[in-house]
């Protein structure tokens, strides 16, 4: 109640009670009303205060709620982080468990591998050792047979190579057949095999080590290469594939790899068997003519070793080793490379012949098929592609050739079957002939290229025997002195009997090696 209302009510009360107006009562009424007004104002103030307090409380509640929401969000984030951390820990634990499992599995596998590896290693070692033994034995047998078959030409070659070192040439051997007859006349029929015992003792391990080293290098290159066709492969220009060595192999070596393998084979075999070669040559020379180099000094292989060691020391057993390595390493390198190349060409020719003969003998056509095939041939430039993989023979051929109408009408399956049916015949008979022919060609090429180095090797090996003068300081000095004293022709003395010796020797050696290797591998497979 405000003052205006109060005045109005006061006026009305005075008017109504004008007859009974009492100032004291009016004053009391005014005071009570004023007190009421004050009370009302205080109540209003309290209400306002309460409202403000409520508003403040609502704000506090809202702020608290916001804080709680923030806390909840933070808790949610923390929970999510904890979940992520737990997931990470779980994944890490899983990874660690997998690693531990893998390690345990590896340990188990290693344990098994040790058993397997011991079984595999035992098997692989056994197989490797069996293979190595097979290579070694096959090469040794091949060397012994091939050198025994050509022992007379071997001895005659050595005599003619070194007889120019003597001042007395009146009793020297000249020619090939005539010299062989003269040798038999002078020394008897057994003279053909004089020194052959030492020759076999030297050549047999030499040949075995040579083939073993070559196969080892070949396996190393095959295991560490992708075997992609190379432009430098030995049959480049034929079919673009790699070198194939021997029946049953699937070699794809390049020419440098093949030559390197051959060089390592020659180096290893020469170093380990060189003293035997020195003994062999000295035994072959003695008694051949009346010069000092041919005098009888040695009574067999054992006596030769001890006498050379006693008279000349260990150096005597390795005299001319540098020159020998310089001549034998390229010799063996070229020999293997040419053999591999000729073998691929030979088998390719045989297969081409079989393909053409099979197609001509098994195909018949009609006039309509001829016309249709003529159209097809025009589209294909009158050519067809025949692909055949003969793993047993190590051949991978892609032959593209023009063919007749009859051959072009033959189904490819019939052509493949007809060739496959002849595969056994190829493996049985033709393989040996192919190996023999390729070995002979390889021997002829190698002999022509490397013969001068062989002359140097032999002369360096025998100089100084029996107190004779040492003529040459080294291989280069020997080359200059031979050219100045005897001429270029001296480097080819004895090459005719050498051809008679080397060509069949290399041919027999490769052919016998392949046969023995196949027989040995078949026995191991059966076991």
UniProtKB/Swiss-Prot annotation:
Residues 1-132, 209-258, 346-435, 509-527 are mitochondrial intermembrane. Residues 1-14 have a biased composition (Basic and acidic residues). The chain crosses the membrane at residues 133-153, 188-208, 259-279, 325-345, 436-456, 488-508. It is found in: Mitochondrion inner membrane. Residues 154-187, 280-324, 457-487 are mitochondrial matrix. Residues 1-29 are annotated as: Disordered. Residues 15-29 have a biased composition (Polar residues). It comes from the Eukaryota. The keyword Membrane applies. Keywords: Membrane, Mitochondrion, Mitochondrion inner membrane, Repeat, Transmembrane, Transmembrane helix, Transport. This is Mitochondrial substrate carrier family protein V. One of its GO terms (molecular function) is nucleotide transmembrane transporter activity. Pfam families: Mito_carr. InterPro entries: Mit_carrier, Mitochondrial_sb/sol_carrier, Mt_carrier_dom_sf. The lineage of its organism: Eukaryota, Amoebozoa, Evosea, Eumycetozoa, Dictyostelia. Belongs to the mitochondrial carrier (TC 2.A.29) family.
């Amino acid at each position: 109640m405000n003052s205006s209302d109060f005045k109005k009510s006061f006026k009305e009360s005075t008017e109504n009670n004008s007859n009974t107006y009492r100032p004291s009562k009016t004053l009391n009424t005014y005071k009570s009303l004023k007190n009421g007004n004050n009370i009302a104002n205080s109540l209003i103030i309290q209400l306002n205060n309460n409202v403000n307090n409520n508003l403040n409380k609502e704000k506090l509640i809202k702020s608290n709620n916001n804080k709680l929401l923030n806390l909840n969000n933070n808790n949610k984030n923390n929970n999510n982080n904890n979940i992520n951390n737990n997931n990470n820990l779980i994944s890490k634990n899983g990874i660690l468990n997998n690693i531990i499992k893998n390690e345990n599995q590896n340990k188990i596998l290693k344990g098994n591998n040790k058993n397997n590896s011991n079984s595999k290693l035992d098997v692989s070692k056994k197989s490797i050792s069996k293979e190595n033994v097979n290579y070694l034995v096959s090469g040794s047998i091949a060397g012994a047979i091939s050198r025994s078959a050509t022992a007379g030409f071997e001895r005659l070659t050595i005599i003619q190579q070194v007889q120019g070192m003597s001042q007395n040439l009146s009793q020297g051997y000249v020619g090939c057949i005539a010299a062989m007859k003269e040798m038999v006349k002078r020394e008897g029929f057994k003279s053909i095999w004089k020194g052959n015992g030492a020759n076999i003792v030297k050549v047999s391990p030499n040949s075995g080590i040579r083939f073993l080293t070559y196969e080892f290098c070949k396996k190393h290159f095959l295991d560490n290469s992708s075997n992609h066709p190379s432009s430098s492969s030995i049959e480049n220009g034929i079919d673009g594939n790699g070198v194939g060595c021997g029946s049953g192999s699937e070699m794809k070596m390049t020419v440098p790899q093949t030559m390197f393998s051959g060089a390592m084979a020659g180096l290893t075999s020469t170093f380990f068997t060189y003293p035997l070669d020195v003994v062999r040559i000295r035994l072959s020379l003695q008694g051949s003519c009346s010069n000092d180099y041919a005098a009888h000094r040695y009574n067999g292989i054992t006596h030769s070793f001890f006498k050379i060691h006693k008279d000349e020391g260990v150096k005597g057993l390795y005299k001319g080793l540098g020159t020998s390595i310089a001549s034998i390493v390229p010799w063996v390198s070229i020999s293997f490379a040419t053999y591999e190349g000729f073998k691929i060409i030979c088998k390719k020719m045989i297969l081409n012949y079989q393909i053409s003969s099979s197609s001509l003998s098994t195909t018949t056509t009609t006039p309509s098929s001829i016309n249709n095939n003529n159209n097809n041939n025009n589209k294909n430039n009158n050519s067809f592609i025949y692909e055949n993989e003969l793993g047993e023979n190590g051949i991978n051929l892609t032959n593209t050739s023009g063919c007749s109408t009859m051959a072009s009408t033959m189904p490819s399956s019939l052509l493949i079957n007809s060739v496959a049916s002849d595969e056994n015949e190829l493996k049985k008979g033709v393989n040996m002939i192919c190996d023999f022919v390729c070995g002979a060609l390889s021997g002829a090429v190698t002999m022509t290229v490397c013969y001068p180095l062989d002359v140097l090797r032999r002369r360096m090996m025998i100089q100084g025997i029996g107190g004779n003068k040492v003529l040459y300081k080294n291989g280069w000095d020997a080359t200059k002195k031979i050219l100045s004293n005897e001429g270029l022709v001296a480097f080819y003395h004895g090459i005719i009997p050498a051809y008679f010796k080397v060509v069949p020797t290399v041919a027999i050696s490769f052919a016998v090696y392949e046969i023995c290797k196949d027989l040995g591998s078949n026995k191991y497979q059966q076991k």
